[in-house]
Regions:
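Sec-dependent bacterial lipoprotein signal peptides
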Residues: 1-24
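Short loop/turn and low-complexity linker motifs enriched in small/turn-promoting residues
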Residues: 24-192
Length: 192
C-alpha cells in the first residue's frame, strides 16, 4: 500500500494563505475610509454650508492581528436625536453612518457605532455610544476617538471575548478633551 505525500497539500495551502493575506492588505469596511486622513474625508453637511462650521471627524484605523487585516472605525448615526440619512444598524455585520460631520456652532448631542470588521468577513459593532450637549465652537475641528480593550471571559470550552470601548471627543488642533469633561460627572453613555 502506497501512502500519498502531504507535501503538495502543504505547499498549496501555504500559497493560498499568502495570496489571501497579501490580497487583503488594503482591506477596509464597505467604502469607508480606512486610514486616518481627515483632509480626504468629505463631511456630511448639517450646517447649511456655513463657512465657519465646526467639523467633527470619527476615528478610523486599520491593522493586522495574527496576519488578518482588521478595520475598526466609528460611524455617526444621530445628531441631536435625529437619525442621519442612510445611517443605522441593519444587522450585526451591516452598519452604516457618517465618518465626518459639519455642524452649526453650539451644543449638539452625538450618537455613533464602534465597528470592527475583518477581511475574513467576521466582526461586529457596538452602537448607541452617546455624548450629550457637547459645545462645538465655530471654525474648530474635533475628533471622536476611541480606545478598546479585550478580555476572554467564561469557563474553559465556553469562553467568549468581551470588548470594552472608551471614547473621547477632542479638539483636533489643541488635543484638548472636550467630552467627557473630567470631574464634572459627565460620562459617555452606552445605550442599550
Amino acid at each position: 500500500m502506497r501512502l500519498l505525500s502531504t507535501r503538495p497539500f502543504k505547499v498549496t495551502a501555504a500559497m493560498m494563505l499568502t495570496a489571501v493575506l497579501g490580497g487583503c492588505s488594503g482591506y477596509h469596511y464597505k467604502d469607508y475610509q480606512g486610514d486616518w486622513a481627515p483632509e480626504q474625508m468629505t463631511p456630511y453637511d448639517l450646517s447649511n454650508n456655513a463657512p465657519d462650521a465646526p467639523v467633527v471627524y470619527f476615528a478610523t484605523v486599520r491593522y493586522r492581528d495574527l496576519g488578518i487585516p482588521f478595520h475598526r472605525l466609528l460611524l455617526a448615526t444621530h445628531v441631536d436625536d435625529q437619525l442621519l440619512e442612510g445611517a443605522g444598524r441593519a444587522s450585526i455585520l451591516d452598519v452604516s453612518g457618517k465618518q465626518a460631520l459639519k455642524l452649526t456652532p453650539g451644543k449638539h448631542s452625538l450618537r455613533w457605532c464602534w465597528t470592527s470588521m475583518n477581511a475574513l468577513g467576521t466582526g461586529g459593532a457596538q452602537c448607541n455610544q452617546e455624548a450629550r450637549d457637547v459645545e462645538f465652537k465655530a471654525g474648530k475641528r474635533y475628533i471622536v476617538d476611541f480606545q478598546n480593550s479585550t478580555s476572554i471571559v467564561g469557563a474553559p470550552g465556553r469562553e467568549s471575548m468581551r470588548i470594552h470601548i472608551k471614547s473621547t471627543i477632542r479638539d483636533l488642533d489643541s488635543d484638548e478633551v472636550v467630552y467627557p469633561v473630567f470631574g464634572s460627572g459627565q460620562e459617555l453613555i452606552p445605550r442599550t
